[in-house]
Amino acid sequence: MQNEKLRNVAIIAHVDHGKTTLVDQMLKQGGVYRENQETVERVMDSNDLERERGITILAKNTAIQYGDTKINIVDTPGHADFGGEVERILKMVNGVILLVDAAEGPMPQTRFVLSRALELGHRVIVVVNKIDRPDQRIHEVIDEVLELLLDLDATPEQLDSPMLFCSARQGIASYSPDVPGTDLKPLFDTILSYIPAPEADLDQPFQMLVSAIDYNEFVGRIAIGRVERGVLKQNQEIAVCNYHDPDAPAKKAKAVSMYEFQGLGKQPITEATAGNIIALSGIGDITIGDTICAPDCVEPLPFVKISAPTMEMTFSVNDSPFAGREGKFVTSRQLRDRLFRETLKDVSLRVTELEGATDAFNVAGRGEMSLSILIETMRREGYEFQVSPPRVLYRTIDGKKCEPIERLVADVPSECVGAVIEKLGSRKGDLIEMTPVGSRMKLEFLIPARGLFGYRNEFLTDTRGEGIMASVFDSYAPYKGDLNRRSTGSLVSFETGESVSYGLFNAQERGALFIGPGVKVYEGMIVGVSPKQEDITVNVCKKKQMTNMRAAGSDEALRLVPPRKLSLEQCLEFLADDELLEVTPENLRMRKTILNHEKRMKATHGGKKK
């Protein structure tokens, strides 16, 4: 039996293709807002970081009443680094909306998430968005989407997907690119007619897979998932099967509070039926992947296999001379608790304690983006710590050392193609496809993940800021040999103190600086970048020696070049193997692992002699 009054659908799109904006318009036209209610753009991006970066990190749930049918909408992250979120969310729905930019076409992350949806047998509605862009190329994009579906072995039914043409910003959709729409009615109607209603076996014992965890300081953990079968009433006895320990006996609990999603919030309910997406609170240490079921019929549900991490970083307690000055949480215990707490929400994250060290932890994730989001989130919460440069995780396959390979798509101006191909070639990248798109060129590469470390800044320089680049994990392949991570060295502070104009003026002749005057520095702190490959020590605290012969006002004013300000991602890309990033709520400071100049020289030259 199917619950015809219900549809569960997820939206798949690449970063910045308008996914959250489309959900905003669906909420408006679905009557979630009162007519006089002030609305915020991109309401589904509820987290500060999401709003700032314009990306969705955590999958969100909402629901719209369209006629007498309730449509549960799940807004998924568009970045492959958050693939752990994407994969388990797809288990909650019966179909997907594939949102594609009318100019950019399908991107690598779109491919990644779509392949997972097709494997699960989901039906797909293709929505070509931003049709009002002056550089739109709708017909080529339609062909690219069909090619992508063929590449991913879509079934004949999935290949025959309906196509809609939309401007999410204007809140319009139509069945033809030549006939402008007036509202999103075509999209709502297509969801009802094409996405199957969820199976609803009400007579069987209750069963639900936990696909997401929310947290509220008043009620604790909230388990979110789709009811697979049966009915659950408030205060009914339930059993919880532990996903991480399948042999452990099921834990008894009670369904204290239940909610369903309505608009932007949750509404308390007294009964949950099969097919609906609900939230349950009152179950202590429940985690993602657990099965909640009736006590007299304990049957764990299979959990979607989450792709393994491909990259790791070491998080450790800050041991710089400025340690403990700016953070609220600085101890190894606090750092450990916070990292392990994150694994409860993010199933694709792995945290392990470093052997022989009580204050360092290896954190493995799906990419630089997911790890940098974790660092920035912890920083805003008041944590102070230090991190190593990212490292790829190697595997041994058939006795050979293998490394993660990324599929990279770069959209660049035609005159910049040579520089991009040359740089990526030197980083062991193989060009596999080259497609002209108007006055631009779309390049596709297979490149080792480590070959992309530190490349994004070079890419923006080589394309004069006009290039678009995106990559996604493709596969593991035999190790491609050594690679120079960085062609530049660091300018390293020689002493502890405060930077002054005279010291900076002399230092800027050796390279580009990251700091201006009046900044507190310590010995071993990185204050700039040197164009040569070796590090150079500089004294940015050096003051000018005054003599009686010289009048103070007769000196020529010192002209300082404005310092380069690096973002968190740029700092992580910049780090060499013997460097660390100190992260505090107020500052990001790059430093050498060995701070003392003499000890560092001894260690370096000692290494060369061996």
What are these language model-derived features?
Residues Q207-M313, A323-R325, R336, T488, ...:
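Conserved nucleotide-binding/hydrolysis modules and their immediate coupling elements
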Residues R123, R133-P196:
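Canonical P-loop GTPase G-domain recognition
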Residues S167, E355-S370:
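Short glycine/threonine-rich beta-strand-turn micro-motifs
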Residues T39-R42, V126, L152-L164, P198-L209, ...:
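Interdomain boundary/hinge elements
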Residues V231, G284-D285, G365-L371, S414-V417, ...:
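Helix N-cap motif at beta-to-alpha junctions
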